[in-house]
C-alpha cells in the first residue's frame, strides 16, 4: 500500500539513507554472516555451496513499495520528487549490497552463482 503521499515521501527523503541494520536489514546481514561462519568450518562445502544476495528487486519496485500505487501519478505530477526517491533508493540499495557482499561467496574463482545457476564470469550483469 505504501505511504501514499508526497508529504510522507519528503519526510523519508529528509532522513536520508536509513540504517542498514534497522528492521529486516539486520536480520538479512546477520543470517548471511551466520551461514558464512558455519560454512567456514567445512572448506569443501564452502567451495560448492554458494551464498548469494537475496532478491532486492530494482530501485523502481522498491520506490513503488514505499510510495504505493500513486507513484504512477507522481511520475507525471511530481517527477523531481520521484527522481529524488529513486536516487535515495538506489544509494541505499548500493550501500546494502556492498554490506552483503562482505559475506557472500558467489563470485569466487571464474564463476558466479545466481538463482541456483552457475555462470562463467564475475557477474551476470553487463554493467
Question: For each of these PLM feature ranges, what is it?
Answer:
Residues 1-11:
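A contiguous, low-structure linker/loop signature
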Residues 10-20:
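Internal, well-ordered domain-core segments that constitute the primary functional module
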Residues 18-127:
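Active-site loop segments of alpha/beta catalytic cores
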Amino acid at each position: 500500500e505504501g505511504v501514499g503521499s508526497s508529504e510522507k515521501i519528503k519526510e523519508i527523503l529528509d532522513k536520508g539513507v536509513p540504517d542498514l541494520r534497522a528492521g529486516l536489514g539486520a536480520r538479512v546481514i546477520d543470517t548471511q554472516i551466520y551461514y558464512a561462519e558455519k560454512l567456514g568450518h567445512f572448506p569443501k562445502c564452502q567451495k560448492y555451496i554458494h551464498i548469494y544476495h537475496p532478491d532486492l528487486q530494482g530501485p523502481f519496485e522498491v520506490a513503488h513499495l514505499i510510495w504505493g500505487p500513486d507513484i504512477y501519478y507522481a511520475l507525471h505530477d511530481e517527477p523531481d520528487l520521484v527522481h529524488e526517491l529513486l536516487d535515495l533508493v538506489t544509494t541505499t540499495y548500493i550501500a546494502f549490497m556492498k554490506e552483503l557482499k562482505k559475506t557472500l561467496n558467489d563470485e569466487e574463482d571464474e564463476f558466479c552463482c545466481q538463482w541456483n545457476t552457475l555462470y562463467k564470469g564475475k557477474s551476470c550483469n553487463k554493467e
